[in-house]
Amino acid sequence: MGDGPNWRSLPEPSRFVGSDPSPPVPRAPGGDTCPVGLAVIDAPWGVRAGPVLFRAPVQGSAKIAVARMLERGEGMTDQRHCYAGVDWASESHHVFLTDGDGRKIGERVFRHGGEGLAEMAAWLMATSGAVEGDEIQVAIEVPHGPVVETLIERGFKVNAINPKQMDRFRDRFTMAGAKDDSRDAEVMASALRTDPRCFRLLAVSDPVVIELREWSRIAEDLSAERNRLTNRMREQLWRYFPALLELENDLGAEWLLDLWDTVPTPDKAARIREATIAKLLKRHRIRRFDAPPCARYIAPAAAQGRRRNDRIRQRPRHYAHCPHPPRQPAAQTGASSAGWPDRQPHRNRAGGAGAEEAA
């Protein structure tokens, strides 16, 4: 065996374009270092390749996995590319630009809009010194939208990542949970440079796919707005007309809205005829119940509403007939050290001021 592994020299690859430069990986009987592939460096003075060595023993499938990873270009950064992180928002976008070694090239904030996005693309090209847009890798937390579409149209390679996954990369820089646009943009640029496998390269979608995506987004927005309005309706009906809530779980149903428009208050619900309810149910093809059960649902609520309205109307009259003690000047009543008048003990009508005077 000797003092160490006797490696045969790897052949120096010739300059290649678009071909696989990796020669067959040599197998070693043992040792502390195991070459698993070639690290290719495209420098101005030529292309060089050398074995990648591990200081710990690497055997079997692990060696093959690392070799395949190096063949795909993972684990190495391309010095010819620049990496930009875009922390997007509804009003402004924070951009952080680095080179292939992770050194900061520039940082700037752009307003959201047509002019702002065009200025962002021009600034990336001018600051990085790139000739083509595909020399700049851009990281962003959203897979679609005007920012993504503008950058793709200008030729940039846009890569998307899930915001939850981005939070884990943020722990590399700081453990603080406060929102920082500059730090988030820097984290995205650094993560794209070191871990490109965690990102998803975006491409221009088919026009039909874009149209379907916009229609589905509109449908989701309308559904969310409908839920918001029905929740407000449920709260209001629970306050003054809870009987309607027992008729239908979906407060956005057309027949229930029509019924509510016909009897907006419990007083009107008490005067509605069953024939009117029957016509309404027939018009909307509601066969779960007939008019009499529906009328029985809303009749008790109407009576309860009338009783409550009577109590509300009687409160001012009761308050007007209540005896009020005459107000006395502040000098006679006295004041506490805090400046508030001294509170008198509560006395009911049976043992009030008249009873004390009689005693």
Swiss-Prot record:
Residues 1-31, 318-359 are annotated as: Disordered. One of its GO terms (molecular function) is DNA binding. The keyword DNA-binding applies. Keywords: DNA recombination, DNA-binding, Plasmid, Transposable element, Transposition. The keyword RNA-binding does not apply. Belongs to the transposase 9 family. One of its GO terms (biological process) is DNA transposition. It comes from Sinorhizobium fredii (strain NBRC 101917 / NGR234). This is Putative transposase y4uE.
